[in-house]
UniProtKB/Swiss-Prot annotation:
Keywords: ATP-binding, Glutamine amidotransferase, Ligase, Magnesium, Metal-binding, Nucleotide-binding, Pyrimidine biosynthesis. HAMAP family: PyrG. It comes from Acidithiobacillus ferrooxidans (strain ATCC 23270 / DSM 14882 / CIP 104768 / NCIMB 8455) (Ferrobacillus ferrooxidans (strain ATCC 23270)). Residues 1-265 are annotated as: Amidoligase domain. The lineage of its organism: Bacteria, Pseudomonadati, Pseudomonadota, Acidithiobacillia, Acidithiobacillales. This is CTP synthase. GO terms for biological process: 'de novo' CTP biosynthetic process; pyrimidine nucleobase biosynthetic process. ATP binds at residues 14-19, 71. Its EC number is 6.3.4.2. Mg(2+) binds at residues 71, 139.
Amino acid sequence: MSKYIFVTGGVVSSLGKGAAGAALGALLEARGLKVTMLKLDPYINVDPGTMSPFQHGEVFVTADGAETDLDLGHYERFLSTRMGKRNNFTTGLVYQTVIEKERRGDYLGRTVQVIPHVTDEIKRRIRLGAADADVALVEIGGTVGDIESQPFLEAIRQMAVEEERGDTLFMHLTLVPYLASAGEMKTKPTQHSVRELRAIGIQPDVLLCRADRPIPADHRAKIGLFSNLPEKAVISAIDTDSIYRIPLLFHAQGLDDLVVQNLGLHLSAPDLSVWNGIINALEHPEGEVVIALVGKYVGLTESYKSLAEALLHAGLRARRSVRFLYVDAEDVETQGTEILAEADAILVPGGFGGRGTEGKIASIRHARERKVPYLGICLGMQLAVVEFARHRAGLMNANSTELDPQTPAPVITLMTEWSDPEGHKAYREEGGNLGGTMRLGEQECRLEPDSLAIQAYGQERIHERHRHRFEFNNRYREPLAMAGLRYTGFSADSELVEVVELPDHPWFLGCQFHPEFTSNPREGHPLFDAFMRAAIAQRERDGSS
């Protein structure tokens, strides 16, 4: 039977429940437990797949093809467990399921209500997602007091009653602000948040108090007094320069000891050698590398969360600190590629729509002509093909049909048939629904010999995650190859081009898949490691330190 740790938040949103929960999960995993995590999102969208990155941040894609909250990226980076469709669900998905059951007659004519039907569906999905794990950490999105969160909070309250005593634990994340005008930290917001949580029947067992500085013992004692908790259960969750310090910060305050004790587990001390090694690499870089990330959503860097983390992982492994130049592609259109001059390497990530496209293409041309290392991911690969077609193959009006449906040279076109992660055929028509209609999830890719890709991965067959509707148009394979473009990665059936390279460039690679989704701080990712080595070599060629 699984044990459950429910993670809630109060005072304000975006306090870092996902990172905090994942850090605790890492500590429990370091004690030998099998840990999984779930994210429950209170919004009505069925999934975040069609939500604007400016509102929601990154959409994280799991191996089984789920479009999920970015917190699942935190979960996979901190834990060895791979997440899937069961690990993230929304109010919209819950209501969709309940309504479908009602239409089928599953409720036998009963009046369908939030309690018990919606809450029962939430509990069913929690238990399903926790199956086979020793401990499941369940993060409730939003904050206590939100109307949208109430069914989820009621469901976990009921679970605490239904599960065996000692099999559930409530961890509440709050804010303890410092008021400069008063010169002190204020505990009242946390007291009110806990009071609101207790009013709906949930008594927290642990408080994680976010603050920009350590919380004094007398403040923690005061918070504990008004929350019915001992001082040791009030943990300082202070700001840090890297989320990978959080497991060690929590362990130093005894959080994992407290949780293990409350859950009635008898375990040995955690093996934190991996996390100590990560922090050692973080604190002792041997140089700096500057990576330009040219994108559409740089106004909210959370849109590229997994990508930034993957580059940081590569930097850790190469003993380099990574400095990002987040470049708005539209700024390249108005200011020119001179704003990329400082970059040791250039990356164009995935994205949708036409805004900023010409700026990305100009950045790719800059990387190609100046011999600057380039990595294009998803749309970044597609636009590399467009740029090459225009300026090397003589197809001056080349484009993607996503960006120009009437282009006379559609080198990138809509994909209408593909295989899903289970091997079943999937189809999409022009004008169909946007939600859930992309090629999603882990797919096999076959790499060509004597290529940058196979040098990076060290094997012919790899598996990477996808999220795209458009693909390389095979009608243009031969003319672009004759102009010098090399295809070095293909889908398992050889129908789809998945990796392109330029043999006359030191390091230029575009991939249709998203390698950032499988990188973690323990093992990194071979493609980002290779990209980082190329960036370091470029910096050394330029004579920078």
